[in-house]
From Swiss-Prot:
Superkingdom as given in the UniProt entry: Bacteria
A GO term for molecular function: DNA binding
Lineage: Bacteria, Bacillati, Actinomycetota, Actinomycetes, Micromonosporales
Annotated residues for binding of Mg(2+) 2: E68
Catalytic reaction equation(s): Endonucleolytic cleavage at a junction such as a reciprocal single-stranded crossover between two homologous DNA duplexes (Holliday junction)
Record-given protein name: Crossover junction endodeoxyribonuclease RuvC
NCBIfam families recorded: PRK00039.2-1, ruvC
Length: 175
């Protein structure tokens, strides 16, 4: 399974691509950071993010997209930008017809480190170790995106299939 993980952000949006199967080490395919200029108008920043993520989805052709779920932050301006970037990220996968799953930061931390309370340094160290990299992915947004992708490979594939089966059952359809 190839998964594109997205750590949404309006100024820096991390994107990580891995391949793997549950219970096995994943393989790094690529990672990127999409940057927007804070001095640009919001519509231009969102448009740049949309075009960049759409191009990365087309380039890497993932089987699934994993996006970090926006959580409440004290800075309303920051959370608004992150929420807008998250919407663009979800749309990039949905527009391509690819299943999109969202994860809370604690779900990702628990999947990758075994602790939902892990800090950034622990997360980056585990991503580096799990992907057998010679050096940590930089910046942290890229490491976070790779952690999301790893989490989805290990947990999300099953979660997505269960959700699809439940949806089919609700609509009265079989397999």
């Amino acid at each position: 399974m190839r998964v594109l993980g997205i750590d949404p952000g309006l100024t820096r949006c991390g994107v990580g691509v891995v391949e793997g199967v549950p219970g096995r080490p994943c393989t790094l395919i690529a990672y990127h950071v999409v940057r927007t200029d804070p001095d640009d108008e919001l519509p231009l920043r969102l448009l740049h993010l949309d075009r960049s993520l759409t191009a990365l989805v087309a380039e890497h052709r993932p089987d699934g997209v994993a996006v970090e779920r926006v959580f409440s932050q004290h800075n309303v301006r920051t959370v608004m930008g992150t929420a807008q970037a998250s919407g663009v990220a979800v749309l990039a996968g949905a527009r391509a017809g690819i299943p999109v799953q969202t994860y809370t930061p604690s779900e990702v931390k628990a999947a990758v480190t075994g602790s939902g309370q892990a800090d950034k340094a622990q997360m980056t160290a585990m991503v580096t170790r799990l992907l057998r990299l010679s050096e940590p992915p930089r910046p942290a947004d890229a490491a976070d995106a790779l952690a999301l992708a790893i989490c989805h490979v290990w947990r999300g594939g099953t979660r997505s299939r269960l959700a699809a089966a439940a949806d089919r059952a609700r609509r009265g359809g079989g397999r």
